[in-house]
Amino acid sequence: MGLEKSLFLFSLLVLVLGWVQPSLGGESRESSADKFKRQHMDTEGPSKSSPTYCNQMMKRQGMTKGSCKPVNTFVHEPLEDVQAICSQGQVTCKNGRNNCHKSSSTLRITDCRLKGSSKYPNCDYTTTDSQKHIIIACDGNPYVPVHFDASV
């Protein structure tokens, strides 16, 4: 009887661990392309210039968890238009790699910069709207944006 009980408990343990174990790993790792979309794409953009846009978006998009991301740019154009930049003029990235591309036209963007007096967890940003060319790094198959390099 003791062996049957042990076998039953062991089987139950294996079953429970089979359910619990996948959740122990946490969320699946975010791809570089998905991270680019989360951190830089806001196709709607602010309905009108708002000084609190960056504070709201940086928090909503998870860039103030654990620390305040010092600088970020949001692009207010359709994702397809930004992805198309990957087939436009190739330029050298800031890090020296050759997988960056410059947009052939200017795009609507918002630059967010952490204010000097701001300290985590109270991340406070300046919001600057503009129209500029952007430089993005592209990678993968399909060849898609994975890093925002600069705006010019």
UniProtKB/Swiss-Prot annotation:
SMART domains from the UniProt entry: RNAse_Pc
Name recorded for this polypeptide: Ribonuclease pancreatic beta-type
Regions crossing the membrane: none
Record's compositionally biased regions (Basic and acidic residues): 27-45
Disulphide bonds in the chain: 54-112, 68-123, 86-138, 93-100
GO annotation (BP), single: defense response to Gram-positive bacterium
Entry annotation: catalytic residues: 40, 147
SUPFAM superfamilies assigned to the protein according to its UniProt record, in alphabetical order: RNase A-like
Species of origin: Rattus norvegicus (Rat)
Binding of substrate, residues: 35, 38, 69-73, 94, 113
Principal location listed in the UniProt entry: secreted
